[in-house]
From Swiss-Prot:
Residues 3-171 form the PfpI endopeptidase domain. Gene3D superfamilies: 3.40.50.880. It comes from Staphylococcus epidermidis (strain ATCC 35984 / DSM 28319 / BCRC 17069 / CCUG 31568 / BM 3577 / RP62A). This is Uncharacterized protein SERP1413. The lineage of its organism: Bacteria, Bacillati, Bacillota, Bacilli, Bacillales. PANTHER family: DJ-1 PROTEIN, DJ-1_THIJ_PFPI FAMILY PROTEIN.
Length: 172
């Protein structure tokens, strides 16, 4: 049975930060499911990419997934704005249980809500690094950072490195 990757997503995601890792994962034989506010609802990226939500966050069970992917753009801000904190709680399952967790650009902001960044080494786009540092993370400026189960990258230019490392992590 193929490993399954949860992708948490809201409107205004950075299109290529969803499509490129999703394609890399699927080409490597992994299954992906998009999780958002409402199943069968369409979310739209910053550049017009349209994606249908497979599973609502209300119905998603983190234990049913082998990894978590959090694309960047403005989507992470919307996810963090969930009044019930469901996306942070969902992500916390992965960080707390050492399940592979992948985040790029603004995506690592969702990990702030897990309260599990203290002492972890991660990266993200420059304008989120202070928030990550304030959450206790050791923030570095590298194209891809692997800290145990967490893989992070900064920007779309880092996608080749990011995709290589997330596939490698799931193949291990």
């Amino acid at each position: 049975m193929a490993k399954k990757v949860a992708i948490i997503l809201a409107d205004e995601f950075e299109d290529i930060e969803l499509t490129s890792p999703k394609e890399a994962l699927e080409n490597a034989g992994f299954e992906t499911e998009v999780i958002g506010d409402t199943a069968n609802h369409e979310v739209v990226g910053k550049h017009g990419e349209k994606v249908t939500v497979d599973v609502s966050i209300a119905d998603a069970k983190p234990e049913n997934y082998d990894a978590l992917l959090i694309p960047g753009g403005f989507s992470p801000d919307h996810l963090r704005g969930d009044e019930e904190g469901r996306y942070g709680t969902f992500a916390k399952y992965f960080t707390k249980n050492d399940v592979p967790t992948f985040a790029i650009c603004h995506g690592p902001l969702v990990l702030v809500d897990t309260d599990d960044l203290k002492g972890r080494t991660i990266t993200g786009v420059i304008n989120v690094r202070k928030d990550l540092s304030n959450a206790g993370a050791n923030v570095v400026d590298e194209s891809v950072v692997v800290d145990n189960n967490i893989v992070t990258s900064r920007v779309p230019d880092d996608l080749d490195d990011f995709n290589r490392e997330i596939v490698k992590k799931l193949e291990a």
